[in-house]
Structure formats: C-alpha cells, structure tokens
C-alpha cells in the first residue's frame, strides 16, 4: 500500500475534495464559459445589433451554417475536458487526448453533458497520468489509454447521466401543474439550481417545451442565480465577476459551492421570491424559444426570448395557446424587475445577512 501511495504521489494523482470538487469543477466551468457561453454572447450581439460578421454563417458544413459563435459553442465538450485535465495537472499528451473524450462524452450525455464530461474526464485524465512516460512507446500508449478509457466509459455512463439530468425535468414538469404561486416557487428554484449545477438547464427546458408562465418562472430562477452571484461576489471579483457571472454563468461558482454550500443561499432565496412574483404579479410569460427559459441572463438570451415572444411566439408557445401581443409598460417593467433588478436587490440583502451570520466569509466567492 505504501508503494502504491508513493506511485500515485509521483504521478500527481491526488484523491481529494479540493482537487476533484473544487479545482476540477471550477476549471470545467471556465471551459464552458469560453466556448458555449461566449459563443452564445457573440451570436446574440450579432443578431440583436446587426453585426454582419457575427450574425452571418462563415461556412456551411453538411448544409448547416456556422457562425463564429456557433463554432465556439460546438467546442464546449472538448474545452471542458481540457480545462479539467489542466486542473488535474495532466501532462501534454494526456491533455490533448482529452479533446476527443470531451467531445464524445458531451454529445452522448445530452442534458447531462457537462456532468458526464466531468466524471469521464476525471477518470480518463487520471488513468492517462498513471501510464504517462511509463513505456518506451509513450507517444502511442498514453493517448490510446486516455481515449479508449474515456470514450469507453462515456459509452456506458454518459447516456444514463443524461437521463438522470432529465429526471430533474420530471420534477419541473410536475411543478408546472401546481397553482401559479407554488409553481412559481418550485420551477424558479429548481431550474435556477439546475443552471448552476453542471447539467444543462437550457436543454431540460427545451426538452420540456417550457414556455408560458412556467417559462417565465424558469427565467426568474436562472436570472436570480446569475445576477445573484454576480452581485454578492462583487466584493471579491469586481466588475469582471459581474460580467462573467451575470452575462456568462453562475456555474463558475461550483468550486466555491462545494467548499461552502451556504454561499448558494442568497441566490436560491432570491429565486424563491422572484418566481412567484413573475407568475402571480407580472404574469410574465416566456413565449420565445423554450431553450431561452433555461438561459437566464447569459448573453441576455432569456430576456431577449421574452421580448421576441411578445411579437413572434415560438412554435412551442403557439401550441400552448400563446398569441402575439404589444407589450405594455407593465410588461417591460416586469421583465426588467424579474431579470435584473429584484434578483440583484434580494440577493444583496440575503448576502449581507449571510455575511453577518458568518455563513459567508470574505474570499468564499472568489473566482480564480
């Protein structure tokens, strides 16, 4: 046993909460941010501001047009895998071999793609590190072992992880059948949590065709998490944190959440309030694309989805009886309050309370 421990130490294989639960998760969120979320932001800028080189496809592959943003988004699996490998101190050959592992796993994982990539990449990277430079044909052995173990493991567990993520969708589907106040609380809290976890809230909302009042509640929960974390972590992260979390993803805080789960209280508490306010007070409906219900303020996709749904309801919304409307001042006020103003104020208040109680300490929300 002593020799085995010494071998693992020599290979820098450290089985610890910090290495796997904080470093790897935090790095994975950065990989997701640099691809899927930056791609989403670029597409949104191109479409809404009429920036030709961002809005127009730059090439067609198999009759599918790809914009710059779409290319960036397509690389989310490889980017997450490489980021995780980097956090695990994987040597170069292992790191490069994780690119196909991440791509395959994310595709097979569906709504649970990010979580599947995390689990599979950790195993593949550590196995690759163990065999790295142990043979005279390392240039063959290391990538073959990493790719075979990674994609082989993904074949068996990525799809079940995706189905497990969709089980969250079953809970959301049940919540949508409740009366508006209860539905607002449940959908907002659950979808907001899903947004921050390493699963795809957008994919879940799309699969459930979540539009109407339920879509509005989902939007409220996502915005509460993104804006909430951006505001309460301003002390530690400044304006860079506001942009990366408020327009990017609250998943960047996953490593810190593992370290101190209580930092999630302000955002969740805010979502429990903004959800029913959206459904009962403002009757806020997401009648744009269902996927927008799970995007929050990422590239402002969520609020823009509500706006486009007013004038041109999506096919999913039309099936639920949605109609085009001319938004009133109350509609615009509700959208602004639910998406940005209320989450910011409520999370700040709950954040101050948590800091006074000693539940959140300086540095707990610091992003690397």
Regions found by a protein language model. Give the residues of each.
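Pore-lining transmembrane helices
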Residues: 1-368
